[in-house]
Amino acid sequence: MVSQGSSPSLLEALSSDFLACKICLEQLRVPKTLPCLHTYCQDCLAQLAEGSRLRCPECRESVPVPPAGVAAFKTNFFVNGLLDLVKARAGGDLRAGKPACALCPLMGGASAGGPATARCLDCADDLCQACADGHRCTRQTHSHRVVDLVGYRAGWYDEEARERQAAQCPQHPGEALRFLCQPCSQLLCRECRLDPHLDHPCLPLAEAVRARRPGLEELLAGVDNNLAELEATRLAEKEALARLREQAAKVVTQVEEASERVLRALLAQKQEVLGQLRAHVEAAEEGARERLGELEGQEQVAREAAAFARRVLSLGREAEILSLEGAIAQRLRQLQGCPWVPGPAPCQLPQLELYPGLLDKNCHLLRLSFEEQLPQKDSGKDGARSQGGDATQPQSRDGVQTPNQEDGAKTPKESRAQTPQEDGGTQARVGSRSNKKRKFKGRLKSVSREPSPAPGPNLEGSGLLPRPIFFCSFPTRMPGDKRAPRITGLCPFGSREILVADEQNRALKRFSLNGDYRGAVPVPEGCSPCSVAALQDTVAFSAAARLYLINHNGEVQWRRALSLCQASHAVAAMPSGDRVAVSVSGHVEVYNMEGSLATRFIPGGKANRGLRALVFLTTSPQGHFVGSDWQQNSLVVCDGLGQVVGEYRGPGLHGCQPGSVSVDKKGYIFLTLREVNKVVILDPKGSLLGDFLTAYHGLEKPRVTTMVDGRYLVVSLSNGTIHVFRVRPLDS
């Protein structure tokens, strides 16, 4: 692209699409120029003309059509000259039909003329060698420039040919345009000069150009200035759009983090209230059990004494009754005087008090404001802004400055997301009216009236670890299910989709990450899928003691029998997607797409034969195998040859058996600890880094996990619910 200050070259004009019509995409024919300076073929413009108006196909400017039609639009002699040069260069082929001399037929020679070897740039004629040698021997042609025809066709003399080229008069063929009629602003040849323009003042073309060039150059300079301003404005508009997108991304992050922290606080309050309720009910049940035991004992004693007295009175003889009268009367008086409280003991019934503001549709925990930012044009102001801080920081309408991530009073995490329990007044800045802000403050303070004593999650090293962002949650039970789902396997299934192995309902269900049900992959009759992995257009799963490979229509490609020494067999797809690994009684077997055994190894080598039991298995993008070893009660990481890269069996497992494992795109390992409702994170070599998910995140008996697209951790719970968390990396 030619810059504003530089002049375009002739080569660029001839080689670019400048000479092509933007309508028919062919070389211009009878070029006509519109007032907007766009040039098209005359026939193409005639097809676009609608009545008295015509709209330019490029700039969409509407121009009036002259009464005489599109033929009356100004002829573009500049384009005509370039087209003549291009046609002259392209005329004839030196290898096929050689061009003939243009002078030989005029001098009475052969009718066709000899083969041309040269060209006169002034006459625009091809010449044979003889005519070329004598062409400059006359007074009229002495100054003509005769050049080699091959070099002319190659473009070596384009500049000279252009300088010596003369525009031809459209009214008088063969006559060059030589004059400019000043009153009519029309180009004239000698014949035109002698007819209607004889009395008009005319100037030679060179003199007319010298007179009019300064005015055009001045106008061009003004347009160049406008172009510079337009370019600066365009760049400023792009920068403003980039700032808008950047700020929008920040707001999205703030909304996600604020929502996450509010959800955490709400879940903590949920656990706290449920704990209090559980403790109250257990204490009440314990007291009730003690009272019921005492009452049942007293009731049994009284019932037995009363039954004995009734038998004596109804069946005994007079002497027998009188002999037992004293003992019976004493016992009955004793039972009547036994202390007991009629009616049930006082019981405190629990009642839930829900803050009414949360159900109010006008209660906005998140509120968005838009601040207009004036453009900065003064470079001095820009410099002051760069030295004195970020002056483009948005302010609210009442002049209060929005907190920045660089403020020293808060960490970046705290400055981006404020929960009601931390700072009830922080949210007040988003309102535009003071009474609304005070009302909103009061709502948030009411919510945070009593801080929750429930312990939060273990965030040891959280500033250095990937962080979870809650994405969505959905159930997996479908209307056709006969039993409650029991999810035993998960795997990614294409982009943003998961495949769920429901062993209880003997189904492989497809869900999007948003929880939309996408149907099911049919499984063979009687199969209950346990572990599942997706390969290239196929699905591998284990059921009982068999490994199956099926296509998406449920057709079995092959099946392999596995060892019966293991209750379940974990299945994992290799990163290449063309092999599947399965854990079989302490070792790992890898099968290719044809069902042939590609390799088999024991983690740690043959010395560990019989010492391993991999219940869960996955692979990393780096090609490593990661498994949960229930016999060693450890998490083991090994390479493709079975060499152990790392193994963890430390206190971070809390004495639990390691559960399901998943690996993100950077190699971080996510290990499920079902007994303590946790998912911990380990580095690619198996060293524990800290907790990733806890009951604080809503985990309740997590069963299996998988990683989708390397950044979404999908966790299934024992009740058939699936939670999806987005893994925020360190460099986010």
Curated annotation (Swiss-Prot):
Keywords: Antiviral defense, Coiled coil, Cytoplasm, Immunity, Innate immunity, Metal-binding, Phosphoprotein, Repeat, Transferase, Ubl conjugation pathway, Zinc, Zinc-finger. One of its GO terms (molecular function) is ubiquitin protein ligase activity. InterPro entries: 6-blade_b-propeller_TolB-like (IPR011042), TRIM45/56/19-like (IPR047153), Znf-RING_euk (IPR027370), Znf_B-box (IPR000315), Znf_RING (IPR001841), Znf_RING/FYVE/PHD (IPR013083), Znf_RING_CS (IPR017907). The modification Phosphothreonine is found at T402, T419. One of its GO terms (cellular component) is nucleoplasm. Zn(2+) binds at C169, H172, C192, H197. Residues 374-462 are annotated as: Disordered. Residues 374-384, 407-416 have a biased composition (Basic and acidic residues). It comes from the Eukaryota. Residues 434-446 have a biased composition (Basic residues). A zinc finger (RING-type) spans 21-60. GO terms for biological process: defense response to virus; innate immune response; positive regulation of interferon-beta production; positive regulation of type I interferon-mediated signaling pathway; protein K63-linked ubiquitination; response to type I interferon. It catalyses: S-ubiquitinyl-[E2 ubiquitin-conjugating enzyme]-L-cysteine + [acceptor protein]-L-lysine = [E2 ubiquitin-conjugating enzyme]-L-cysteine + N(6)-ubiquitinyl-[acceptor protein]-L-lysine. The modification Phosphoserine is found at S452. Gene3D superfamilies: Classic Zinc Finger (3.30.160.60), TolB, C-terminal domain (2.120.10.30), Zinc/RING finger domain, C3HC4 (zinc finger) (3.30.40.10). It is found in: Cytoplasm. Residues 211-286 form a coiled coil. Interacts with STING1. Interacts with TICAM1. PANTHER family: BONUS, ISOFORM C-RELATED, E3 UBIQUITIN-PROTEIN LIGASE TRIM56. Belongs to the TRIM/RBCC family. E3 ubiquitin-protein ligase that plays a key role in innate antiviral immunity by mediating ubiquitination of CGAS and STING1. In response to pathogen- and host-derived double-stranded DNA (dsDNA), targets STING1 to 'Lys-63'-linked ubiquitination, thereby promoting its homodimerization, a step required for the production of type I interferon IFN-beta. Also mediate monoubiquitination of CGAS, thereby promoting CGAS oligomerization and subsequent activation. Independently of its E3 ubiquitin ligase activity, positive regulator of TLR3 signaling. This is E3 ubiquitin-protein ligase TRIM56. It comes from Bos taurus (Bovine). The gene is TRIM56.
